[in-house]
Amino acid sequence: MPEQGASWAVFMEDPLSLEQCAGRLERRGFRSFVVPGLKEAAEVMLGLVREFSPSSASYGDSMTLKAAGILDDLRSNPDIQFYDGFVPGMEREEKWEIRRRGMTADLFLTGVNAVSMEGTLHWVDMVGNRVAPVAFGPRHVILLAGSNKLVATPAEARERIRRIAPLNARRHEGFRTPCMHTGILSLIHI
């Protein structure tokens, strides 16, 4: 886990399940927030950014983070060096270099493929630029998950990833993975 622990902003519909999941995440060392929607999740995340006062920030690609608008807030903050390795049209080598720098930023934000009711987080990461910073690097990590990410068990998390990861991979130019064509992630040890 990152030095200061991770913060978790989550929004979903079923408050009972959410509170249970949040409690299990907290037992694993996460600060957890249950909020009713994306707007409120963005407000919590902005509050955490103010609390952390990072001099640098980066992110792992996440449609939910983009929808929340938090990335635009970080980009426009003159006090934060924002490492954005996802700029369209940027040369591949430059993207890699910026993503490497982002892994040691003061703040890293990302989504997650699935969260089990047991309080476990599940990812499949094509290049590792989301998982690596969550495990080590930034002083602070904020994870954001929508209701679509909550599953009952780790086995259900793996099944969700098998179905969803190929759809997500299709969004990225220049990547050619087998699952993009078959529609099913087929890793042996997932």
Q: Predicted segments — roles?
A:
Residues 7-13, 38, 123-126:
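Short, functional N-terminal and low-complexity linear motifs
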Residues 188-190:
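Conserved small/polar residues in nucleotide/adenosyl-binding loops
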Residues 95-176:
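Long, charge-patterned amphipathic alpha-helical coiled-coil/hairpin "stalk" segments used as oligomerization
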Residues 51, 75, 145, 183-184:
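Alpha-helix boundary/capping detector
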Residues 1-28, 52, 170-177:
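Iron-sulfur (Fe-S) cluster-binding modules
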Residues 176-184:
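Phosphate/pyrophosphate-binding loop motifs in nucleotide- or prenyl diphosphate-using proteins
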Residues 14-99, 104-109:
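N-terminal active-site beta-alpha-beta segment that forms phosphate/nucleotide-binding
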Residues 8-9, 31, 86-88, 141-148:
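Flexible, glycine/proline-enriched loop segments at strand-loop-helix junctions
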